Amino acid sequence: NTFTCCVGSGIENHGKYAEQIYSHDGKNTLWVNLFIPSVLNDPANKWVLRQETDFPESNRILFLLDQKNKEALNLKIRMPYWAKRMDILIDGVMYKRLPDSSGYLNLGSLARGKYRIVIEPEMELYTEAMPDNKNRIAFKYGPLVLAGQLGKNMPDPLYGTPVLLTDNKNLKDWIRPAGGPLQFELNGVGKPNDVKLAPFYKTYDQFYSVYWDYFTNEEWSRRQNEYEAAKKMAAELEARTIDYFRIGEMQPERDHQLVASEKSYV
């Protein structure tokens, strides 16, 4: 029930997205940047492009183009960095295209007429590591960050957030579907237990974790005592801490009613 700057930014985002769904060079080239249901109507150039999709719930994106200009429209669609391939059907015919140097698939010159274009960027699981720690990773599926569901009660500070323990480097063996769209779960690699994974944007009203520490069995046998001792020390310090104030961050300074001027900082 708070209204912080984060909430305002979250609301503002949607307006910003609308600014960038499409780009046009003012002539006959149109770029599709984002996959968001929308209608682009350009009376001056005599074409209308409708985009229909529930992405990322589904990877199917439909474009309905009504092109009435005598000059052909050059249509380019962004191929996301996370997509290994992207199927393209124009009026039911499959086309193969490679992205250009800017990462866009050129559908070619579309003459006057109506077109039904379907694209399906392939979404798959992969990991992304912290810049300073290659063994602290996040799980991603296409553009989505997956969060581990830790329940409504505060997890145990030592063992509530699992580590990943396996010698198997094949990510597809770590995670399996969990019965619903965009729902996954760890598969025998969580220590002390596996957890369910869901898109971060759908995770609320519970505790969660996004980053996971990964160990091989040999690394864990060497570091287990050290790792658990560090977590125990952090938990004990937190239990003894009355307050924690991060100077230089807006929200903590407001929470602590800090009054300062430019002379207050060194």
Across the structure, where does each feature detected by a protein language model lie?
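Short proline/glycine-enriched turn/loop motifs at strand-loop junctions of beta-rich domains
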Residues: 70, 79-84
